[in-house]
Amino acid sequence: MGRFRGSITKQSRREGINLAETEKVQKYLDRRPYGPGQHGQRRKGRPSDYSVRLREKQKLARLYGMNEKQFRNLFEEASNVPGVTGTVFLQLLERRLDNVVFRMGFASTRRQARQFVGHGHILVNGKKVDIASYRVKIGDEISVAEGSRSMGFIQENMDAQKRRRVSPWIEMDQDNFKGTFSRLPAREDLALPINENFIIEYYSR
């Protein structure tokens, strides 16, 4: 499974969840709560246990914009860490720099966050980091580079973020275009429409 680069709205309809986590895509899903294409509204037969687990794995990987190799490697790492594997796995996903940039509201989607990171618009503890998969640590300060703060996209995103609830594991200083990753998110903090146990079962088969 490579990284999906097509329409995020169409892919969200196929997976049945809001992969972009934006109001725009959610409104579209509310209007068309079925798969894309001329056969999207047809009732399908009961899926097999394998296909249910495969689809759950694909949904989570696409939600975070990862290819199969990245996703599998991260899962294997989570499996070797003490604790609840599913929760540890989700925490590792949440610690990706592109995801933290998205959570802080600097970018409107994770896809846009990856672009911002890759183009050098994001700093970690005052230093430029251009690797989307960089793992953010507790206490790290993430900020927008001084020269990038006047960009129209970033200004619009920050204005929109002021109207939304900030993730409880993040402390924001929106006026100064920065935030701190203050703690690991608990499972109940993450409103993800995902059953991570299915993913554990998929990789354990």
Swiss-Prot record:
Keyword RNA-binding: yes
Alphabetical keyword list: Ribonucleoprotein, Ribosomal protein, RNA-binding, rRNA-binding
UniProt-annotated stretches for the region Disordered: 1-51
InterPro entries: Ribosomal_uS4, Ribosomal_uS4_bac-type, Ribosomal_uS4_CS, Ribosomal_uS4_N, S4_RNA-bd, S4_RNA-bd_sf
GO CC annotation: small ribosomal subunit
GO MF assignments: rRNA binding; structural constituent of ribosome
Composition bias type Basic and acidic residues, residue spans: 12-33
Disulfide feature: none
A GO biological process held by the record: translation
Residue ranges occupied by any S4 RNA-binding domain in the UniProt entry: 95-170
Cited CDD domains: S4 (cd00165)
SMART domains: Ribosomal_S4 (SM01390), S4 (SM00363)
HAMAP family xref list: Ribosomal_uS4_B (MF_01306_B)
Family label: Belongs to the universal ribosomal protein uS4 family.
Description of how the protein assembles with itself and partners: Part of the 30S ribosomal subunit. Contacts protein S5. The interaction surface between S4 and S5 is involved in control of translational fidelity.
Role according to the record: One of the primary rRNA binding proteins, it binds directly to 16S rRNA where it nucleates assembly of the body of the 30S subunit.
Protein name: Small ribosomal subunit protein uS4
Source species of the chain: Deinococcus radiodurans (strain ATCC 13939 / DSM 20539 / JCM 16871 / CCUG 27074 / LMG 4051 / NBRC 15346 / NCIMB 9279 / VKM B-1422 / R1)
